UniProtKB/Swiss-Prot annotation:
GO terms for cellular component: plasma membrane. Regulatory subunit of a potassium efflux system that confers protection against electrophiles. Required for full activity of KefC. Shows redox enzymatic activity, but this enzymatic activity is not required for activation of KefC. Keywords: Cell inner membrane, Cell membrane, Flavoprotein, FMN, Membrane, NAD, Oxidoreductase. HAMAP family: K_H_efflux_KefF. Homodimer. Interacts with KefC. This is Glutathione-regulated potassium-efflux system ancillary protein KefF. It is found in: Cell inner membrane. It comes from Citrobacter koseri (strain ATCC BAA-895 / CDC 4225-83 / SGSC4696). It catalyses: a quinone + NADH + H(+) = a quinol + NAD(+); a quinone + NADPH + H(+) = a quinol + NADP(+). It is a peripheral membrane protein.
Amino acid sequence: MILIIYAHPYPQHSHANKRMLEQARTLDGVEIRSLYQLYPDFNIDVAAEQQALARARLIIWQHPMQWYSVPPLLKLWMDKVLAHGWAYGHGGTALRDKDLMWAVTTGGGESHFAIGAYPGFDVLSQPLQATALYCGLNWLPPFAMHCTFVCDDETLQAQARHYKQRLLAWQEANHG
């Protein structure tokens, strides 16, 4: 099962993430947990989130990039749900050998994230990758959709279909 942990503070204004989720929903075996819809008060049901993670074989952290990081509710979710003794540390093996993919949308172009004036994706992904590895997760190559503020609908749809193809390829390679 693919579990998408979706964190968009303003989903009603989303163009790219909305299309990505629409494409993901067309696949069997995909569960989407929209954190800002589930927890508008930021009071996370840790047990429910851990149960969802336990069912998953591929976990996706999907969100718009905000200040080169994750939205605040996703960070809180990580702090609470990825608990010592459950996700890491003594007895913390619940996530071991599951796959994790970071699916992120950006307003900037792909060239903005090339090494140069701003940090590249290799640098920006390090905290997430370190978290994944610390929890025993297999870090998969990220999926990034760039220029989402200026892309036309056709481009957004094409990129969202590419996202679906990544998920489908994972399902085929991992038998669901």
